[in-house]
UniProtKB/Swiss-Prot annotation:
Gene3D superfamilies: 3.30.420.100. GO terms for cellular component: cytosolic large ribosomal subunit. It comes from the Bacteria. This is Large ribosomal subunit protein uL18. It comes from Acidothermus cellulolyticus (strain ATCC 43068 / DSM 8971 / 11B). The keyword NAD does not apply. Signal peptide: none annotated. Part of the 50S ribosomal subunit; part of the 5S rRNA/L5/L18/L25 subcomplex. Contacts the 5S and 23S rRNAs. Keywords: Ribonucleoprotein, Ribosomal protein, RNA-binding, rRNA-binding. GO terms for molecular function: 5S rRNA binding; structural constituent of ribosome. The gene is rplR. One of its GO terms (biological process) is translation.
Amino acid sequence: MPQLLSRRVGRGSTRTAARMRRHFRVRKKISGTPERPRLVVHRSARHVFVQIVDDTRGHTLASASSFEPEMRSFAGDKTAKARRVGQLIAERAKAAGITTVVFDRAGYRYHGRVAAIADGAREGGLVL
């Protein structure tokens, strides 16, 4: 499936197209299993969204985002919110019985908010 979708992404030099190509390239190698699901990160200009996905069944096991009502009142910059989202996803993963995950940065650089999510998840007790 990722190979089919990667053909739709043009060979243009836009940042989004380049990120999508990186994401498809990585997704060929990374897949979530029931024992070790995939922690997927999506980043927008203002918010971050995180899901834990079992790719064998195609189910989302847990999710968290900075868009949730409880995060709206959280004081801090976007990186601090991303760290808190990482801690939230770790709490929800533990409640679902998940201790280890495969980190899928979705073509984003491991820097800033993406790294803060990973650090927050580790602080929450999730093994990446």
